Amino acid sequence: MTNATSAPPARADRAPASKALFDRAAAVLPGGVNSPVRAFRAVGGDPLFIARAQGARLFDADGAEYIDYVGSWGPAILGHAHPAVIEAVREAALGGLSFGAPTELEVRFAEKIRELYPSIDMLRCVSSGTEATMSAIRVARGFTRRDAIIKFEGCYHGHADHLLVKAGSGLATFGAPDSAGVPESIARTTLSLPYNDPAALEAAFAARGGDIAAVILEPVVGNMGCVPPEPGFLALVIDLCRKHGALSIFDEVMTGCRLARGGAQERFGLRPDLTTLGKIVGGGMPLAAYGGRADVMRVVSPLGPVYQAGTLSGNPLAVTAGLATLDRLTPALYERLEELGASLEEGLRAAAEGAGAAACVQRVGSMITLFFTKGPVRSWADAATSDTKRFSAFHAAMLARGIYWPPSQYEAAFLSGAHSEEDIERTIAACREALAA
């Protein structure tokens, strides 16, 4: 791995194999990638192409080694290529890759999720977080027979049309599309409100409570950086939904099994009506799920009129990886993640203060963000004050020192059980140098 005290080489000279692969990719993939954040557009330069991963390490196409804080954007809570998960998937593959028919494995998976999440009576497996949130909203609309939904600025729930929406100019105005290709007629059914703003939420329900099918949110936001809920905010969401006949949806694709075995709802002691899960529950494979109250989930086909299907839903390899991962989420793992997270938080904060940087560090469990703004960051409006140019320079300097930090100011970093105390020390040392550069 690059020594944290060595002078960083020029970026173009550091990864010629990645550069060659990116040039090839640009000819056949839009932007050279299969998901926009991977292109490094937010931080400049070309992305690294990863050849393999092990534990808390990534190895790029040029053979360089990095301490990884992206963790495949959250799933790798045990670290990469955990031997037990790899062996379970290898054994399952010998029995067939996909059947398009029910299996005992998917029943065991559903039973395990229900054990971890008391709010979930029944669930349906899908293949991505976008599918999970899209389906949960369809279920909420079908159950309530209403169309409007509330989301919060800075909360990302996948790329379904009705979720790629930003707020209009007024409190309860119609939404406007945040992406080309999203019809305004669809966007108008989505109300976007400031996160952590109880007054705005109460006013929206007062104005349009009878139209609202659901409120969906990340209970701890990770897609504008790590932003925790203000005390009482999550409970208010649930209470207002119940009062007005709407459904509360916790999007725990990121926080599920990350903040606790039972996710944010275990950590905060709350039970939403519907929950979406992904990332960790798939053990690094394409697996997600949505579920909740039995009376709500009974509207899902073939029991009810809300249609949702998928060729690879409940895929045996993905479910096997998920079960192997879930079985290894022990109290000791979360204690270790908390200790490592606290050490990293303290070190990053001290490094920022020592450099005189206008920055703040926010962490919940093993999710953490160094914001280049004074903070605290409670909403998208706060996050948007971050100095993204300073972050880009920081990211490049960290990468040059062997630290693979998320390539966006607005993405949380993740710790895993494979990180060591030495990894944390190296990362803090690299951060001190990066901030002084």
From Swiss-Prot:
Catalytic activity as recorded in UniProt: (S)-4-amino-5-oxopentanoate = 5-aminolevulinate
This enzyme's EC code(s): 5.4.3.8
Record GO biological process: protoporphyrinogen IX biosynthetic process
InterPro entries linked to this entry: 4pyrrol_synth_GluAld_NH2Trfase (IPR004639), Aminotrans_3 (IPR005814), Aminotrans_3_PPA_site (IPR049704), PyrdxlP-dep_Trfase (IPR015424), PyrdxlP-dep_Trfase_major (IPR015421), PyrdxlP-dep_Trfase_small (IPR015422)
UniProt-annotated location(s): Cytoplasm
Cofactor field: pyridoxal 5'-phosphate
Pfam families for this protein: Aminotran_3
Alphabetical keyword list: Cytoplasm, Isomerase, Porphyrin biosynthesis, Pyridoxal phosphate
Enzyme class, spelled out: isomerase
Residue pairs linked by disulfide bridges in the UniProt entry: none
UniProt KW Cytoplasm keyword: yes
Any one Gene Ontology molecular-function term assigned to this protein's record: transaminase activity
Residues with PTM N6-(pyridoxal phosphate)lysine: K279
Any single Gene Ontology cellular-component annotation: cytoplasm
Pathway given in the UniProt record: Porphyrin-containing compound metabolism; protoporphyrin-IX biosynthesis; 5-aminolevulinate from L-glutamyl-tRNA(Glu): step 2/2
Subunit structure, as described in the record: Homodimer.
NCBIfam families: hemL (TIGR00713), PRK00062.1 (NF000818)
Family that this chain belongs to: Belongs to the class-III pyridoxal-phosphate-dependent aminotransferase family. HemL subfamily.
HAMAP family: HemL_aminotrans_3
Full protein name: Glutamate-1-semialdehyde 2,1-aminomutase
